[in-house]
Amino acid sequence: MIYHINMDKHSLIDLYNNEVLTDCQLHLTDSIETIVMNVHKNILYMSCPYFKSMFTNFREQKSSTVKLDVHNARITYDIVKSFYGFPLEEPNWKYQIDTHIVKDFLLLETGLENINLLPIPAEDFDNFIDVVDKIGYNEFCLKKIIDNIPDNYDLSKFPLDLLNGLLAVCFKYDLHISRETGVYIWSFKYNKLVLSYFDSSIIDIEQTFDGGFYFSSSTIIDSNHEESSDDEVNDDEDTDNEDTDDEGYCQISLFKFNISRTNDKYEASILNTGLKIIGPIAYSKHFNQVFIVTDKYNICVYDTDIKNLVNKFVFNDTIEIIAPIKDKMVVVTSIQIIILNLLDGKNLSKIDSNTNIISYNSNLGVFAYINNNTNVCIYSLESLSITTNINHSTTINHILYSPKSKYFIFCDENSIIYVYSTKDNYSLIKTIDFKKFLKFGVKDFEFMTSKIIVAIDIKGKICIWNIETEQIIQNIDCSEDYNNIYNIQKINGPDYSIHKKISKIIQEKTQSKLSISS
């Protein structure tokens, strides 16, 4: 007769607690204490590569006493007990990190990249840096430093190589996606959709410097959302809120859309500004104001600090596009492009053109527009003249400047993207056939950095591409049937502020090193 022994974890726990048939006394010593355990060699052998090697190849295989110098005796004790089925508790971040160090010593899988590290109190942050310094600045540790940097912490005391490592794991931007059913936010940090706001009537959306948004919607927002009260527009202002009689135009509401983030949990809150508009909206970082088309001939200026209308500009033709660029604004009407001085309200120049596509770059002081579908015109706001023409053979659907003004790109109806150098008189550098990457072609694209393009097709498949290396960085599939894409835009991500802070310190340290060497 053959008997099968069933040793579950409760049997092993009893075996340990009662010290039945123990054949080894394990001494665990760190800088503070020594803990002695009565254990079973066969359990250690089967549970841990370190002990397996020890009891196979070294003198300890015949010894009844084993002495180990360890990083943390208490945690090593807990890990050895876990071989018997005892739960391994992780009460704080220090315990979690020390557990990784001990497991690494014992040749166990640490699973460090999967640890949901507990929050690190501000008073413990320097201690955390000291601990990380011992185990090495791997990607996991760098990300945890970013996630736990206290407010107003002096990052300048970090060495340049550490700052560059931190910058490499910062996620400065999220991706805002407008679809038929509403708006979505894709997090590159968490590699998933983190917010879905269902409102199929959202027309336009603009981000402000504080990370919030203003958007226009033709539906009544859910009563659970916050309504305007103290912030409501003054009734004495001429808001042009009377319903328009113009055929094809209807007034819609302007809302403020705020996002609160707790790790990968994003929540939206909505505030009704009390304003009615009919057309596009545009945000001016220079003035911290939102420009809104209140009827087809008028642009009103909404100050986001005092939350009231402060100015109005009147035009003779239907307004199609507005783009504030520092102290000027490009206004595209149904028959021409007007350059407006925002300081005195005077028209600086007019261009006869019927276009619905423009892109501007405030650093270069220029904007680009499409003329007759196939011609790109580069217009200087300094000379008030066209400085460059790019002629193309097919219809151009999108144009865009890179953040640091290095590149100008456009995409034609065949989903081929053309890359031009702004530093070399708009010379063509390369072309990219995005039909190879996106089955349904390019619906919209956006620069995430000065050299990284994010392109999306109408269904929601995303391709992230490096202009300089010509390599695909990532493919993302957030496609949905019967929920087509309208457009995408980058928005401030969870690491936006810290990214800017680190970038500034790196620049200062680099300049300092250069000045010393020279």
UniProtKB/Swiss-Prot annotation:
Judging by the UniProt lineage, the source's domain of life is Viruses
Chain intervals with Acidic residues compositional bias:
228-246
Q: Does the keyword rRNA processing apply?
A: no
Q: Which cysteines are joined by disulfide bonds?
A: none
Can the keyword Repeat be found in this entry's annotation? yes
Where does the signal sequence lie?
none
Task: Fetch the Pfam families from UniProt.
Answer: BTB
SUPFAM superfamilies, per database record: POZ domain, Quinoprotein alcohol dehydrogenase-like
BTB domain: which residues? 22-92
Region: Disordered; residue ranges are 224-246
Ranges occupied by WD repeats: 391-430, 437-475
Q: Which UniProt keywords apply?
A: Repeat, WD repeat
Q: Which CDD domains match?
A: BTB_POZ_ZBTB_KLHL-like
Please state which protein family the record places this protein in.
Answer: Belongs to the mimivirus BTB/WD family.
Protein's recorded name: Putative BTB/POZ domain and WD-repeat protein R731
Organism annotation: Acanthamoeba polyphaga mimivirus
Lineage of origin: Viruses, Varidnaviria, Bamfordvirae, Nucleocytoviricota, Megaviricetes
